[in-house]
């Protein structure tokens, strides 16, 4: 089997054709406790990262937004308020379990009039060219098998002048933070997953997938190669997370 035939699933090398199913099993397992675990793992800081993302989105009333890997709907909820009744937000997720949790939570909280729910693969988005004013993907790109293809798809469905937002775990810029983060990721996260979600292996994969994700400069270059311009990134919490932005010319 050649290098082109395999890809990483955490630290493991698996056939390209199998990664999607491996990732699906992880998110089928964690869907019900996903929001609780996010709060515990980040001590609530993920809400600040997402708020920063919204602030950088430039989304206004009447806009059309695609939230890829939208999961339980954190960003979708915020975009829904911004675009208002004249706008539209599409929450897309490849995982049916996550999509169902997101749909239920949003509808239970009175959202839905301007939201569509679509099960979709980021590598083959089921939307026409030039469909959206903004495309976001938060903590989802690292789980995609072919990240370059996914970025090309995001660029394709953006309207000219539209903005892509990629919020993802990245590489800490402070050596002390980096060392502490490693200890936390590989010790505390699996333990927390075992105690709260009865699933340590999925959270071990989370830690490994973060380490395998491209660093800030590499992801910026990948976005440029996908056809986006004005690409930049913002390091959050000493680079533990980075928000990358790019614009379609």
From Swiss-Prot:
Biological processes annotated in GO: aerobic respiration; menaquinone biosynthetic process; methylation
Residue positions binding S-adenosyl-L-methionine: 72, 93, 121-122
Gene3D superfamilies according to UniProt: Vaccinia Virus protein VP39
Gene from which this protein is expressed: ubiE
GO MF, one annotated term: 2-methoxy-6-polyprenyl-1,4-benzoquinol methyltransferase activity
Catalytic reactions of this protein: a 2-demethylmenaquinol + S-adenosyl-L-methionine = a menaquinol + S-adenosyl-L-homocysteine + H(+); a 2-methoxy-6-(all-trans-polyprenyl)benzene-1,4-diol + S-adenosyl-L-methionine = a 5-methoxy-2-methyl-3-(all-trans-polyprenyl)benzene-1,4-diol + S-adenosyl-L-homocysteine + H(+)
Alphabetized NCBIfam families for the sequence: MenG_MenH_UbiE, PRK00216.1-1, PRK00216.1-5
Species annotation: Hahella chejuensis (strain KCTC 2396)
Protein name per its UniProtKB record: Ubiquinone/menaquinone biosynthesis C-methyltransferase UbiE
EC number: 2.1.1.163, 2.1.1.201
InterPro entries in the cross-refs: SAM-dependent_MTases_sf, UbiE/COQ5_MeTrFase, UbiE/COQ5_MeTrFase_CS
Pathway the protein contributes to: Quinol/quinone metabolism; menaquinone biosynthesis; menaquinol from 1,4-dihydroxy-2-naphthoate: step 2/2; Cofactor biosynthesis; ubiquinone biosynthesis
Protein function: Methyltransferase required for the conversion of demethylmenaquinol (DMKH2) to menaquinol (MKH2) and the conversion of 2-polyprenyl-6-methoxy-1,4-benzoquinol (DDMQH2) to 2-polyprenyl-3-methyl-6-methoxy-1,4-benzoquinol (DMQH2).
Keywords: Menaquinone biosynthesis, Methyltransferase, S-adenosyl-L-methionine, Transferase, Ubiquinone biosynthesis
UniProt xrefs under Pfam families: Ubie_methyltran
Family, per entry: Belongs to the class I-like SAM-binding methyltransferase superfamily. MenG/UbiE family.
């Amino acid at each position: 089997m050649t290098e082109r035939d395999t890809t990483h699933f955490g630290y493991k090398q698996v056939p390209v054709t199998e990664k999607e199913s491996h990732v699906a099993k992880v998110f089928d397992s964690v869907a019900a406790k996903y929001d609780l675990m996010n709060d515990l793992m980040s001590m609530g800081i993920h809400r600040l990262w997402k708020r920063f993302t919204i602030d950088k989105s430039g989304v206004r009333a009447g806009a059309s937004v695609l939230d890829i890997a939208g999961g339980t709907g954190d960003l979708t909820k915020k975009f829904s308020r911004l675009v208002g009744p004249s706008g539209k937000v599409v929450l897309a997720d490849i995982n049916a379990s996550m999509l169902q949790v997101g749909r239920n939570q949003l509808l239970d909280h009175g959202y839905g009039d301007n939201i569509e729910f679509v099960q979709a693969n980021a590598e083959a988005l089921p939307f026409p060219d030039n469909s959206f004013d903004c495309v976001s993907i938060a903590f989802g790109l690292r789980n995609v098998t072919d990240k370059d293809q996914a970025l090309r798809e995001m660029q394709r469905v953006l309207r000219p002048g539209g903005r892509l937002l990629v919020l993802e775990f990245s590489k800490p810029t402070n050596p002390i933070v980096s060392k502490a983060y490693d200890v936390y990721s590989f010790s505390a996260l699996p333990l927390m997953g075992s105690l709260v979600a009865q699933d340590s292996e999925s959270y071990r994969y989370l830690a490994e997938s973060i380490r395998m994700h491209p660093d800030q400069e590499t992801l910026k270059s990948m976005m440029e190669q996908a056809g986006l311009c004005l690409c930049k990134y913002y390091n959050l919490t000493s680079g533990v997370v980075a928000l990358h932005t790019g614009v379609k010319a």
